[in-house]
């Protein structure tokens, strides 16, 4: 991974595919690696009742031949076919290997971040740069290729096409020529959704990243608007060095996009999924309280049962209660995700949520209502979600600050008195011992 290459975490791939919703046509991944975007897109199309090999045509470019072979094998295992080109002739910086500029229905990618020493002259001759070249250094090289990739992804799309890709977080706010390109890009009205991702989503690197989404076929509701989602604090911990989005978290983030697009029926369908799992009798909040109490009781019951079990039965009892607690915890997690979504959007009306999501206009001219609205132009063309969504309000924990401080003060005085008593006792003992 010295030149920025690393494989894409599955939950990021799923997020990209879920938001783009591929159905039919040409899908290009110009930095295809092991083919994760193709596999997930194939699954998405097949699960919708279609045949991915019949409705989709998969094209990939991959500079590293080994990765290209891995991609083809991976696709074959999943019953997919595609055209993958490898080697220097498939280096996307210098070659449109499939001649797909302006022809793609979908572009998905996780390109290597912050690549340097890209030959500027070769890039210019390879075209696909509708907004011009990024900054060029004295050696006639592009010092950071992030905006080459961003330009390519946009250029490959046909009218009505959609793109989704992973990018280094720094690209949302980089300056110089990058900022000029970003302004031109935003003014097209085709930047659709921006998502900030937290640390530790990658297996080998802890860096934060962003997901970018373009749509050259926006509906009237989203024309001249962008949705910003700051999901840096929304994830499931897998282990000390790895985070991910669970299936329900992916659906919840996707639901925000549905409501932004005016697709309320999809949101209602998700609520019904939650009700199918949890039941309709009680609110999500009530079920959280009930399940939390059940888990507490189950732990107490498990402790007693294991203590009272014979030596030969202890392991069996432990396994039995581990399974019970795991099942209860799984349901509790579903209830928490249901409540997370419902308390924000209720029966399906989009609203800006401080610290989570914000809809902004592209330009000052596009703003049709001034109250509470903001444009990307007035934020100096930044695409950093955190600059728009703000900070989530601090939840009231029900503790009176003054009372709690007085209580802490009393505790400190008590500890101080105890400390003084102990010091006196120690000194007295040491004197008696002649020390």
Predicted regions and their residues:
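Conserved S-adenosyl-L-methionine
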Residues: 2-109, 114-125, 132-136, 147-148, ...
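A conserved structural/catalytic subdomain of Rossmann-like adenosyl-cofactor enzymes
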Residues: 101-431
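ABC ATP-binding cassette signature C-motif
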Residues: 433-435
